[in-house]
């Protein structure tokens, strides 16, 4: 029964190490996705510390690849030192992922206040030129999220750009995709996106942080199983000094 249990633990452990390699790629992708998306919305969110969970996720992803390599070698060779190192590193990564989850929730709660403070400034500095980074950011968000203004299109009437142009219109990025003849005129509100951008930007950023949180939780659970299997192998060897290696001279014990 004990031999069957240890063999099963090793099989699961090798399989988990292969999963760790896949997880490494997924975590790095999630972290990179956060960076890319943040670059599109950075004008609406000034707190760069929000990127910290993404940085940690990428670092954890790189470390998981190394862990998978150590785990496979240690499991196949039944190296006591290797397995102990494997468990220790997994424990460190697990604690790190718990920190990521906590930080993710902390920054997720701050998103709404951060966006509310930043978006007011961005809309005030809009000048309608493609050379201005803030203007490009607003046009990009309005097209991508299908929104107009902070709370609705009427917010544009309070901007310096609207007062200077004096043509009673909003940026063309406010035009609905289906309104082919839209010129941004407030006289035709049905051609404009009715929803404001602030709520949608908040929702988008919170969704991104939730991706990070769920990725960290999912792989933390897998790592717990990996630590359990490695501990079973280690405990078996410590209780039974005569226990043979799983693979000895090319044959299974």
Curated annotation (Swiss-Prot):
Stretches of the chain found on the membrane's Extracellular side: 33-50, 107-212
**PROSITE patterns, per database record:** TM4_1
- State the SUPFAM superfamilies in the record: Tetraspanin (SSF48652)
Stated membrane topology is: Multi-pass membrane protein
Known glycosylation sites: 127, 152, 167, 183
Q: Which residues cross the membrane?
A: 12-32, 51-71, 86-106, 213-233
Which keywords describe this protein according to UniProt?
A: Glycoprotein, Membrane, Transmembrane, Transmembrane helix
Please give the superkingdom of this protein's source.
Eukaryota
Task: Choose one Gene Ontology CC annotation of this protein and give it.
Answer: membrane
Give the Cytoplasmic membrane side ranges: 1-11, 72-85, 234-253
Q: Where in the cell is it found?
A: Membrane
Q: Does the keyword ATP-binding apply?
A: no
Q: Outline what the protein does.
A: Regulates the proliferation and migration of oligodendrocytes, a process essential for normal myelination and repair.
How it assembles, according to the record, is:
Interacts with claudin-11/CLDN11 and integrins.
The entry's family comment says: Belongs to the tetraspanin (TM4SF) family.
Q: Which PANTHER family match?
A: TETRASPANIN, TETRASPANIN-3
Its protein name is Tetraspanin-3
């Amino acid at each position: 029964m004990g031999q069957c249990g240890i063999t099963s633990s090793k099989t699961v452990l090798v399989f988990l190490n292969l999963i760790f390699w896949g997880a490494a790629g997924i975590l790095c992708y999630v972290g990179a996705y956060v960076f890319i998306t943040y670059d599109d919305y950075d004008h609406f969110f000034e707190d760069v510390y929000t990127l910290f969970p993404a940085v940690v996720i990428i670092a954890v992803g790189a470390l998981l690849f190394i862990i998978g390599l150590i785990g496979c070698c240690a499991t196949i060779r039944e190296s006591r030192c290797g397995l102990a190192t494997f468990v220790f590193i997994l424990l460190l990564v697990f604690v790190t992922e718990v920190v990521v989850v906590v930080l993710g929730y902390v920054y997720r709660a701050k998103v709404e206040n951060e966006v509310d403070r930043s978006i007011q400034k961005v809309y005030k500095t809009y000048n309608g030129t493609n050379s201005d980074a803030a203007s490009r950011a607003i046009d990009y968000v309005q097209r991508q999220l299908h929104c107009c203004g902070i709370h609705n299109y009427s917010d544009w009437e309070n901007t310096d750009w609207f007062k200077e142009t004096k043509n009673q219109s909003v940026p063309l990025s406010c035009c609905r995709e289906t309104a082919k003849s839209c010129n941004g005129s407030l006289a035709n509100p049905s051609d404009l996106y009715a929803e404001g951008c602030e709520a949608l930007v908040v929702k988008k950023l919170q969704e991104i942080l939730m991706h990070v949180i769920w990725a960290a939780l999912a792989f933390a659970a897998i790592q717990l199983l990996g630590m359990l299997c490695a501990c079973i192998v280690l405990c078996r060897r410590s209780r039974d000094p005569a226990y043979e290696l799983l693979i000895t001279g090319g044959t299974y014990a």
